[in-house]
Amino acid sequence: MKLNIFTKSMIGMGLVCSALPALAMEAWNNQQGGNKYQVIFDGKIYENAWWVSSTNCPGKAKANDATNPWRLKRTATAAEISQFGNTLSCEKSGSSSSSNSNTPASNTPANGGSATPAQGTVPSNSSVVAWNKQQGGQTWYVVFNGAVYKNAWWVASSNCPGDAKSNDASNPWRYVRAATATEISETSNPQSCTSAPQPSPDVKPAPDVKPAPDVQPAPADKSNDNYAVVAWKGQEGSSTWYVIYNGGIYKNAWWVGAANCPGDAKENDASNPWRYVRAATATEISQYGNPGSCSVKPDNNGGAVTPVDPTPETPVTPTPDNSEPSTPADSVNDYSLQAWSGQEGSEIYHVIFNGNVYKNAWWVGSKDCPRGTSAENSNNPWRLERTATAAELSQYGNPTTCEIDNGGVIVADGFQASKAYSADSIVDYNDAHYKTSVDQDAWGFVPGGDNPWKKYEPAKAWSASTVYVKGDRVVVDGQAYEALFWTQSDNPALVANQNATGSNSRPWKPLGKAQSYSNEELNNAPQFNPETLYASDTLIRFNGVNYISQSKVQKVSPSDSNPWRVFVDWTGTKERVGTPKKAWPKHVYAPYVDFTLNTIPDLAALAKNHNVNHFTLAFVVSKDANTCLPTWGTAYGMQNYAQYSKIKALREAGGDVMLSIGGANNAPLAASCKNVDDLMQHYYDIVDNLNLKVLDFDIEGTWVADQASIERRNLAVKKVQDKWKSEGKDIAIWYTLPILPTGLTPEGMNVLSDAKAKGVELAGVNVMTMDYGNAICQSANTEGQNIHGKCATSAIANLHSQLKGLHPNKSDAEIDAMMGTTPMVGVNDVQGEVFYLSDARLVMQDAQKRNLGMVGIWSIARDLPGGTNLSPEFHGLTKEQAPKYAFSEIFAPFTKQ
């Protein structure tokens, strides 16, 4: 079986056989910059949500912390910790429990200056050169005074490695290691910050991105060789422009204001983002114009918007007319509008506030209010775009004050074990809300916890060949230890494997001297008394069986069940997402939308402009592996997600969505929810509150072989289907599975066989026709030969045979109608696999011939040209090979009722 190691919200959704991760993983080491990092800290993997500073520590990050960009993704595996290291402290970066972490020959540069801890060896494909006042956004490895340095972000020629200090936010050079004798010999080893050769005066700096000082920069724009050139006319925003000014072409390196003039830009000017690129051609000047003055802007102030500070007490109401307002130069028609409601994140938002439309120029916090903003206010990222139309105010609303209404959302107090709670009390515990169904005494159940009594079993001697899982106890030399997670061959008696406080990634918790009882002590243990307050590790007897208390406990017997259940506050959600106007089509093109990306397309605009009316939203997963709480990608709650306005607008336009639960990464609800009834209720509530007609379960990665979650899911789906039937509701269920050209894997067939055995009625089986990892599907540089398309149609043909065997009473047409195919457009995760437009045409022909139930793609955000590598935001082909939404143009006609 192939295991998927990709995060679907970052790249794709297919099974991977032999591919590198989308993000290079490393131990946390004070990373700084606008790049996307994936780091290991204290046994967990974190990713930065926006620009990160070296002083931001993952260990201090919280789920919605606007001051810390690190976000917890999952627990690191033992292999990852072994390979990349495991930083344990915010105070000393680079400390690792792994002996395999890279350590430099010296942690002190040759010049004796302070240095950042080593960041590993120089990659084999990177050359080491002498420091020569390099400038730009590319990555250099330079020799200076006997040491090798690497720039952590955009570097200026005035930045000298000799001046760099640990965590220095003003100097991007970071010490890597001591230089070798060969490197010193070949580079001449510059030793002075003033003696390096001066860069040629006629060479202008490369148009690289440098963060503006003292502000959170917007996500780096991706430049394209085929950029559009326009005349400078006071452009404003975070889009990337190439403008003509006084015979030269300039590009903005970060957010640019209308008052920033290219003519005022200097080489290292941190106050002006314009950077010289090259001389404009005569044709470009003739075609686009050539403004030469900073004081005279053509075309009515050059199209620049002069910010207005409307008075909140007197809301601005535009005069209705039949004309649409002029669109700002940096507007993106494929992204949607919404009322301001305290949006937070690095996504680009277009919001309505007090009669106007605003757009954030960089990362925005929930406390940043559009009122009073201006281009000169570097502390507030909101920028006025235009006046909202009457239709927009009617559709999206018009907040006029900076007070954020929580929409009736319940705010719960933190759980206290020493406190008693009445029935229906709601508490907050580990960033989740729980509600108790009965009165709860002090020192009772902990929300989300197991019964505090554990059946007594003499701890067995530890064995190196035995696999231990969480909760298993062993004895070594008279000392007891408890496994904190899966472990094998890790001797608990070794300090290197011990985790006394739960603060590192080691597997064993020391418990002290092993408890052992004689038969007489066990038989004469005191009988359980609910009125007694028991200390932890107390032996009792209950119904003839001995138990040990795992915590302080009272009025809870070993047979009681935990009355606390995860509580999701769905207040107002049904209204936020709107109601579909039409039935879900029997044959539909429903591309996947990574609904946790920073740049989610405007679904209504796609319906209007590209005839794509149905989408599959991905992915709802558990908050973490141990918390039975649905979230969007672990990052966003279900109740008041800011992106719901996109669903409502799509439904108003006549389209609809289905939702996908699961994915390759993070824990599915079926894994974290051990109680089938709890799992069933979550499925019911998701469908009910998001007004869904179709629900998809994406089962892949390790979860396609996890029997416990497979069985829980199928049992819960059967239960919720029975409930829907009793209420007269017809909700379609699809299972999405990985596939090979030869058909489903044995694990995938097991999922379907178990579903059938438990009575689950599937509307369809969608397969991920991508990332096969098979030599016959290698298709790079074979455009037009339809290699990847043939692998997809072969997979569908073999799936048909497998489903026919599972459902012998269904006709061929019925089997075809319950199949779906979802390729990954463009460059796939598996190296050498590429899905071209010609492949799409072949897949479309096969889908129409068979009359399949569904066609999808991973993903709609990737249906854009750009780059040559993997990305969540483009397909890796040129615009000549596949223009914007070219794959959707092929597949969109597939939809029919």
Curated annotation (Swiss-Prot):
EC number in record: 3.2.1.14, 3.2.1.17
Chain's role: Bifunctional enzyme with lysozyme/chitinase activity.
Domain GH18: 586-877
Biased segments, Low complexity type: 95-111
Keyword Disulfide bond in annotation: yes
Compositional bias (Polar residues): 113-127, 182-197, 322-333
Protein name listed in UniProt: Probable bifunctional chitinase/lysozyme
Chain's gene name: chiA
One GO cellular component term noted in the UniProt record for this chain: extracellular region
Induction behaviour: Silenced by the DNA-binding protein H-NS under standard growth conditions.
Positions of the Chitin-binding type-3 domain: 25-91, 128-194, 229-295, 337-403, 459-529
Native source species: Escherichia coli (strain K12)
Higher taxonomy: Bacteria, Pseudomonadati, Pseudomonadota, Gammaproteobacteria, Enterobacterales
Disulfide feature: 628-673
